[in-house]
Amino acid sequence: MNPVKKTFQYGHSTVTLETGRIARQATGAVMVTMDDTVVLCTVVAKKDVNPAQPFFPLSVHYQEKTYAVGKIPGGFFKREGRPTEKETLTSRLIDRPIRPLFPNGFMNEVQVVCTVLSTDRNHDPDIAAMLGTSAALAISGVPFNGPIGAARVGFNEDKGYFLNPTVEELESSELNMVVAGTEKAVLMVESEAKELLEDEMLGAVLFGHQEMQAAITAIQALADEAGKPRWDWQPPTDDTTLKSALAAEFEAKVGEAYRITDKMARQDALSALKDEALERLAGEESGQYAADDVKGAFASLEKRVVRSRIIQGEPRIDGRDHRTVRPLSIEVGTLPKTHGSAVFTRGETQAVVVATLGTLRDAQLIESLEGERKDRFLLHYNFPPYSVGEAGFMGGPKRREIGHGRLARRGVQAMLPSEEDFPYTIRVVSEITESNGSSSMASVCGSSLALMDAGVPLKAPVAGIAMGLVKDEDGFAVLTDILGDEDHLGDMDFKVAGSTAGVTALQMDIKIEGINEEIMETALQQAHEARLHILEQMNTVIAQSRSEVSDNAPSMATIKIDPDKIRDVIGKGGATIRKICDDTGASIDLDDDGTVRIYAEDKTAAKAAIDTVLAITAEPEIGKLYRGTVARITDFGAFVTFMPGTDGLVHISQIVPERVNDVRDYLSEGQEVIVKVLDIDNRNRVKLSIKEVTAEEKAAFEATPAE
């Protein structure tokens, strides 16, 4: 086929979608060019279904190539390795809005690969990758109820909302939001903000949805001209006989099981009912059904029972109404040797969160297409299998753990002090020890508590809450603080984090084909109520950061010196600074502007290092007494080292009142003496005297503790 292009304006960028030139053997392939950023997006779908696979096998792989910015990869092998955190997060960002648009029952394997071929570093390539994926699916012929559009939205008081901000514009923006959706509805939101109001967040979502229509129109035009014929795929037919048989015998029993408030007991009861259903209905005899069909029908029955009760306004699975937060238990300072710790429990979801402070040298070095940078705030989320009562594989973090950790980080990050105000590297680890819904938001609450316990001066405490949705033709219900079952059986996962003043993070994933403004507004309002309730409970335990960091944390001090004295502190080949560190046990960071940061295991070591640095960088004062050591003797006097790196001359006439014929009669090299500074000439040569030190001055000086 001949190449086909469609071009449209997107904010201040020109976007071109091209197909038919590159990767022509893929089911669908689109090259997206956004200014000088180029991303190749491919889709391959298998025609055959693996009958042993009980789920939809969609995989998304976003990869950044270093040649895109004219670089060769580091490391021994000099090639790209396993996915970076950025690549993993972007893969999830692409996956989330497209997954609900594949029809129910479609089980063919679909693989999406997005490769960044070139980037101008002005824009994150993620939006180009999302648009390219949508376009590749739209032209592939695969059953897909798209296309979707995607937009990044920024906001500040001067400009209001703005589309497709550059990396530089995001630095001054109060919002970084990615919105994705179809022509009619929003499907996904991912954002971080600086305490924006709920109305401002909702406005950003609506603005992004409105602006993405240009992209959707262009993608649809590309599909109309270059799209392949749609697959002749039909959804599997429901076996109404099986569903009726299940409902007749098990609907009431399933309803009773979902009135058991304890999660593990409820799961045991449902498992027993499922086994009973399989025993009665599954088999190879006449009138029996395949085991997989029975399992699928039983899952549908569970979903229908729970959803219908919620829509009818009945109590939820654990007996709550739609707006009630589960009981909270909050503890801080629970781990004795850590720098800060908290245990946050909400119902059957629990997070043990630990904050650790380190030096700026502990900051993580991140290499990306945008260049190298150091990250001094790390938040890691761990979800071990025991948290849900299972035995499972223990290994490195999975995509879900990386994504939940980043969401929790977004919720807290806006409240952190600046590096100038708090020059520590901060690591927070959230260990999920129990899980029954919204563990990422428990991590936000626990992180805020642990950071305050560690003495990190947060601008304000933050809390997070997860909202759910059940929607059908009869109406909808928004649920506050959803359980795991409500998340699984519902239509939306809507997570909001923030302070009393506003929202710091918002994430939304829709499992149906979009929601409207009314539902989002209701969810934001209920989330606001719940967040204030949780913050009120948190404040009864710890309302503000501790005034000092933990005694177990590194002692840190910052001093300013004359920038011209930096070389004196470093010394020849770094000898001086190494000696200070070896002698005191402290570590020292120097900035070009003369800022000296000193880190030590305790305050004594920090003070010793400070005193040494100040002594090295101090200027001698005329008339002041110093304790020095004779460094060298000459015929005309003696050179005395009286400050680190600073010598002065005691002339032969300034040793004693009487005449001196031989300096060595009075002084010897290595001898300790008390000297007075007489003068400093314009070449910074220091004149010292021993004889001018009076007996009274000497006695007072020796009585003063050495600094």
Swiss-Prot record:
Keyword tags: Cytoplasm, Magnesium, Metal-binding, Nucleotidyltransferase, RNA-binding, Transferase
UniProt name for this protein: Polyribonucleotide nucleotidyltransferase
The organism of origin for this protein: Chromohalobacter salexigens (strain ATCC BAA-138 / DSM 3043 / CIP 106854 / NCIMB 13768 / 1H11)
GO MF: 3'-5'-RNA exonuclease activity; magnesium ion binding; polyribonucleotide nucleotidyltransferase activity; RNA binding
UniProt-listed SMART domains: KH, S1
UniProt gene name: pnp
Enzyme class, spelled out: transferase
Annotated PROSITE patterns: KH_TYPE_1, S1
Subunit and partners: Component of the RNA degradosome, which is a multiprotein complex involved in RNA processing and mRNA degradation.
Subcellular location: Cytoplasm
Source organism, top-level taxon: Bacteria
GO terms under cellular component: cytosol
Residues the entry annotates as binding Mg(2+): 487, 493
GO BP, one annotated term: RNA processing
Keyword presence, Nucleotidyltransferase: yes
Secretion signal span: none
EC number: 2.7.7.8
Similarity comment: Belongs to the polyribonucleotide nucleotidyltransferase family.
Keyword Metal-binding: yes
